[in-house]
């Protein structure tokens, strides 16, 4: 599976590399170091992970669709992917992904909304292509038009 096919990101490996940081390898072949403090310390539901010994017990969830810890604690791969992009120089892709999530748009629906090809949208989501400022502005314009109609 490749992320640009529109499937949810899947992780192949995880290793703790620092204070609430993990090194991840995604099925797409991309490797990122991700600092999870923002999520861990920003979520009451994950407060047990603030303990470094508990955090160090991270493992991959079934199929690589999440990071899991004992006690039924987990963080979804899509959330980790967005954070990985944002922290590793792809803030444009992260912003684009958040726009899609906010409006519940599939790759095809996002392509139709912006008058672009589905493949190009997939490239943006995967971080393979930079999301041009004009596209991010088009997202805001689409959102504004949609709000005006509602």
Regions found by a protein language model. Give the residues of each.
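Motif-centric detector for short Cys/His coordination patterns
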Residues: 1-150
